[in-house]
Design a protein with these regions (language model features):
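Electropositive polyanion-binding surfaces
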Residues: 39, 190, 195-197, 214, ...
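A short macromolecule-binding patch
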Residues: 103-108, 169-175, 672-689
Length: 731
């Protein structure tokens, strides 16, 4: 016993082996002598020293270590060094993504060098020990993805620190009391790192740069989500002041230079709570029987000069952000909600695509022009839907209203709205016939009280009134892209930001095929674009209304490439368009403003714009779009958890919406809130995940949980900080 105590507690061979691995991994490339190793690991007894020497010898057989001399070793990195991106996971399963697009490689916490998610790093590959997965270790952090972090302050008498959500770091960020900037215990705050850990300093040291307010306050929590993604939660005063100086007056020169549509029936159709009206539609019948449909878009580029302080802020933001209870606009409120917004009964400047359509919705002619419009009516989608249904339209069938009765269609401007709907449905049918992919996704919505609390939770799906607007916006975007990009063979098109969507990823399509075959479905994983699209549409139709439908749609969406902006056109797979851009939402998307400016430039005989400059802007806008989407999803998750937090202990009918190796996802039938039943809480048996058949099977009683099964759940936990709901199976 005496010998065991001298060097501290006894150590097994496995424990000592792990300590030796960690020690060598922490000092890649360094030759370490027995003396240094024994001292660092406090191996004071002869048996422990001999055991360490034996283990190191075995490690040379595994190619984990290289013997340098009789009494020194070093880590065998095999000289493999690569650069790439570090991906941090809250469960400790961090990974390294090589720049060359290779397979992600595991990086243990001890080998991460305090890298944070998204950091550019250099790694060396550790020699793989027998029965061990391939591992990398960070040897240099090339570029930090960020140096500011958002979290909750804990302040006591002796110290203060920041707790980050999702456990960004193994240890919390220590904050000197003098650097709190007035922050109090339980406040949400933004902290900047002053000192990263290194060989001499083991702690993260930070300072508060902004205090957001007390945890739990609705405004504070929404601003926290924005801050976590580096999105602005306040508008710079100088930019707002610049917007105040802009006049909304329409001059005689404006009238002289623009087509006047103020006498043509025009309306906007938007969500009930919308304030920024980007687009309007006008319609009239021409003497030749054709329909003149105008797609009128707010002329933002007339008011926002390229390179101005407002423009620079818009570039930085690149998009408006739509959280559950608020909009964070790309442009100052005076512009997006007033001057540019196509409000009813006000003269407005627009950039318009005017179509002449025959009765079959074939485009017989078009022109792209600057206009002055005056919206006669501001409709909510629900109002238009009511008018359509009052005149015989059955939502979702794709069928237009029957022929007008003797007294005409019922409702305000019903004849015009019914005609627009009929033309839109013809356009939609042509698009799907050409190979467009059909994904009708439902979105979770909340009714919010005056304090920002969710009081109702429900799904909203796109209806015929939504699709009416969508089809004319798609037509305008496509036409604008063709007007610049579609040129004679052998000539080079002028620079334009396109909205591109590549063909599905073949490997992910194969994953989809393997997944759906378990449910008896098929899908084409190769072939022409049209064949793949038709196959995907058949799959969506076949599984519609089935228990597995939601999960199949989710896996199918993951097989799709992400749409993005680029000056290098490859077409749009999902829409089946060879040319497509974004022209119709310049109030909330910067690429649309770019397109407006370039159209004007080229219409005035200007030369092609700098391709490299516009590609850089496209890449930035694509990145910011993803950031905004993630923030929007987080706000939905937060409100869902907040909604259920007051219902702890309550039981609900639900159905199984997802199954993984670590538990069951269940969606409540009544309100569509989704939570997880961890595997450890399925206490009636020990369950195995059957990956082939996508179910859990009990070892003793052989009870099975599978997709779509009805299940009675009890709300167990609601973690607002992590935005997670936990359920248990109700007794």
């Amino acid at each position: 016993m005496g010998k065991g105590k001298k060097g501290g507690k006894r150590m097994s061979k496995k424990q000592l082996s792990e300590r030796l691995q960690d020690f060598f991994a922490s000092q890649p490339g360094k030759t370490l002598s027995f003396k240094e190793i024994f001292r660092a690991l406090k191996l004071d007894t002869h048996p422990l020293k001999m055991l360490a020497i034996d283990i190191m010898e075995e490690m040379t057989w595994d190619d984990f270590l290289t013997r340098v001399t009789e009494s020194s070793y070093k880590l065998n990195t095999k000289g493999q060094v690569q650069e790439g991106t570090f991906i941090r996971k809250s469960n400790g399963k961090n990974s390294f993504l090589p720049d060359d697009g290779g397979t992600p490689i595991f990086v243990s916490e001890r080998n991460s060098m305090w890298a944070t998610n998204g950091d550019r790093v250099k790694v060396s590959f550790m020699a793989r020990r027998k029965k061990h997965i391939k591992e990398a270790q960070v040897i240099e952090i090339l570029q930090r993805s960020k140096d500011q972090f958002v979290g909750r302050l804990r302040v006591d008498r002796n110290m203060a620190y920041l707790i980050t959500p999702e456990n960004t770091f193994v240890h919390d960020i220590i904050i000197p009391k003098r650097k709190l900037k007035g922050g109090k215990d339980n406040d949400k705050a933004i902290v900047k790192i002053m000192q990263w850990p290194d060989a001499e300093h083991k702690n993260l040291i930070g300072e508060v740069v902004d205090v957001l307010g007390q945890t739990g306050d609705n405004d504070v929590e929404m601003n926290t989500i924005l801050a976590q993604y580096g999105l602005p939660y306040v508008y710079p005063k100088a930019v707002e002041e610049a917007a105040e100086r802009i006049s909304g007056e329409i001059t005689k020169q404006d009238e002289a230079e623009r087509e006047d549509f103020r006498e043509v029936f025009t309306c906007t159709i938007d969500p009930r709570d919308a304030k920024d009206f980007d687009d309007a539609l006008s319609i009239k019948q021409l003497d030749n029987g054709q329909w003149q449909v105008g797609v009128h878009i707010a002329d933002v580029s007339h008011y926002v000069t390229e390179g101005s302080i407002i423009d620079k802020e818009a570039v930085k933001r690149a998009t408006s952000v739509y959280l559950v209870d608020r909009t964070i606009p790309m442009l100052p409120e005076r512009l997006c909600n007033y001057i540019c917004s196509l409000r009813p009964d006000e003269d407005k400047l627009a950039y318009s695509v005017i179509f002449n359509l025959d009765d079959e919705a074939n485009v017989k002619d078009y022109r792209i022009v600057h206009t002055i419009i005056r919206s006669n009516r501001r409709y909510a989608y629900e109002e238009v839907q009511e008018i359509l249904e009052a005149n015989g339209v059955i939502d979702g069938t794709g069928e237009p209203a029957p022929k007008a009765p003797k007294g005409g269609y019922k409702g305000e401007n019903a004849d015009k709205l019914v005609t627009l709907d009929r033309l839109a449905k013809l356009l939609r049918a042509k698009r799907f016939k050409a190979g467009a992919v059909k994904f009708d996704r439902e979105e979770l919505h909340f009714d919010i009280d005056e304090h920002g609390k969710p009081i109702r939770c429900y799904f909203k799906r796109s209806r015929d009134a939504n699709k009416l607007i969508e089809e004319f916006m798609l037509l305008a975007n496509r036409t604008v892209a063709e007007s610049i990009g579609k040129i004679k063979k052998g000539r080079k098109a002028k620079t334009l930001p396109y909205r591109i969507h590549d063909n599905p990823d073949p490997q992910k399509m194969e994953t989809l095929r393997q997944f759906i075959v378990k449910f008896g479905y098929k899908v084409k994983t190769d072939g022409t674009k049209g064949a793949m699209a038709r196959s995907l549409n058949k799959l969506m139709d076949d599984c519609d209304g089935r228990p597995e439908s939601k999960m199949i749609q989710s896996v199918a969406l993951r097989a799709m490439m992400k749409a993005k902006y680029s000056v290098h056109n490859i077409g749009h797979f999902g829409l089946a368009f060879d040319y497509y851009t974004h022209f119709t939402s310049p109030i909330r998307r910067y690429p649309d403003t770019m397109v407006h400016r370039l159209l004007t430039r080229y219409a005035n005989g200007g030369r092609s714009a700098n391709e490299k400059h516009y590609e850089e802007l496209c890449e930035h806008c694509s990145e910011m779009e993803l950031v905004a989407q993630n923030a929007e999803r987080d706000s939905i998750k937060y409100k869902m958890v907040e909604f259920m937090a007051e219902k702890l202990g309550e039981t609900y009918d639900a159905h199984i919406s997802g199954i993984t190796s670590y538990g069951i996802y269940a969606e409540i039938d009544e309100n569509h809130c989704e939570g997880m039943i961890p595997m450890r809480d399925l206490g009636d048996d020990y369950y195995d995940f059957d990956e082939r058949n996508f179910c859990l099977i009990g070892r003793r009683h052989h009870h099975k949980y599978q997709l779509g099964d009805a299940i009675r759940i009890q709300v167990a936990k609601a973690n607002l900080e992590k935005k997670q709901l936990d359920f248990t199976v109700a007794e």
